[in-house]
A protein has these predicted regions:
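Phosphate-binding site of ATP-dependent enzymes
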Residues: 183-270, 291-298
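ATP-dependent carboxylate activation and anion-phosphoryl transfer catalytic cores
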Residues: 1-25, 261-362
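Active-site nucleotide/adenylate-binding loops and adjacent lid/helix of ATP-dependent enzymes
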Residues: 1-37, 72, 87, 127-210, ...
Length: 362
């Protein structure tokens, strides 16, 4: 396991940022970065439809990549030439969410093509994107998570007698998710979730408390756990898709440093690190919790491709820890490029030919 850097030690954080700048300044040529971004999932299409360009994560990432002098190109995974374009780049920076973006499928493609990429690998991405698998893993390592049931289409449903969250098993940004507080709302909530993921629905006990999120960033000398953030939707029942994705309503969302007792903060960091290490996350991640009135944290989800707009939870947490947006970008590029290098050739002649095309284009 990697050492942990205390976010309260500003000198240590500053040293890490300086080490990243020296590493990047020592590169002989600008990095050729493929930022993978587009509307491949319902979540991303919703984001593109509702978020003004100036507030989107790709705009902020473009700004930071320009600041650090990277030679970057935005590649749309829906473009027919997407796969053939990839070998021309030194590294891929996925900026996608939901199925085909952060669920291990894109990561598997990049891994197969021997293209370094930012963020977690295939296994961690796949498990974290599947809420059911992730909750089972949480339980297996002793991290508290709300009780749940799994319901399939056509299954007889019974009101559990207490409020629950109905969630699609795959996908994020609360798309397809509903708070169900009475029996009349149960069937519409299930149908809404099934419309997003027709396989099965996670019906999770609704835990009343303070929503908190914790960012984790892999730096050259270890893991930095950001100060916990309290994330509350004002005037809404919960932090729903509209609050997360529709930035025109950002005034209805409160994101602040969480004022927590030392013992609760310690528990949060311990649980976040247990999930990071146990799942084998890499680069960066954001773990969402809810804290009850008695100070008990319950883990909800692990996000392996956090949103990176200027006002995103991850960027705000990094700022509280003393890092700029450009520092975070350097960190995830550094982590991806300093992993164990590939030492075997491309596995098929077809992929070898694709690599040659990329080399010629370069």
């Amino acid at each position: 396991m990697l050492p942990v850097i205390d976010a309260r030690d500003r000198e240590a954080v500053h040293r890490e940022a300086e080490a990243l700048r020296r590493w990047h300044d020592g590169l002989t040529e600008p990095l050729k970065v493929a930022m993978v971004y587009g509307g491949g999932s319902q979540e991303d299409r919703l984001y593109l439809a509702h978020c003004p360009p100036e507030q989107r994560s790709d705009t902020t990432l473009r700004r930071s990549l320009t600041e650090i002098g990277a030679d970057f190109t935005v590649l749309d995974p829906c473009d027919p030439g997407f796969v053939r374009s990839l070998p021309a780049f030194d590294i891929a920076l996925p900026n996608l969410h939901g199925p085909y973006g952060e669920d291990g499928r894109l990561q598997g493609l990049l891994d197969y093509l021997r293209i370094p990429f930012c963020g977690s690998g295939v296994a961690a991405s796949a498990v974290c994107a599947d809420k059911l698998l992730c909750k089972r893993f949480m339980r297996s390592v002793g991290v508290p998570t709300p009780d749940w049931q799994v319901w399939w289409p056509g299954q007889k449903t019974e009101w559990p007698g207490r409020p629950v969250m109905a969630k699609p098993v795959l996908g994020g940004s609360s798309v397809g998710m509903s708070l169900v507080q009475d029996v009349a709302a149960l069937v519409p909530a299930l149908e809404y979730a099934w419309a997003c993921d027709p396989s099965h629905v996670l019906v999770e006990e609704y835990v009343v408390g303070l929503p908190v999120t914790v960012g984790v960033l892999q730096l050259p000398s270890g893991l930095l756990v950001f100060p916990p953030l309290a994330t509350e939707a004002i005037g809404a029942e919960f932090y729903d898709a509209e609050a997360k994705v529709d930035t025109n309503g950002r005034g209805a969302v409160s994101v602040t440093a969480a004022d927590l007792p030392a013992a609760v903060r310690t528990d949060l960091i311990r649980h976040a690190l247990a999930l990071w290490n146990g799942l084998g996350c890499g680069g960066w991640a954001r773990i969402d919790f809810v804290i009850t009135g008695t100070g008990q944290p319950y883990a909800l989800e692990v996000n392996t491709t956090p949103g990176m707009s200027a006002e995103s939870n991850f960027a705000v947490g990094a700022g509280l820890a003393g890092l700029s947006h450009a520092d975070v970008v350097r960190a995830i590029l550094h982590e991806a490029l300093t992993r164990r290098p590939y030492d075997v050739p491309l596995p098929t002649p077809a992929l070898g030919a694709a690599a040659e095309v990329g080399e010629t284009a370069a």
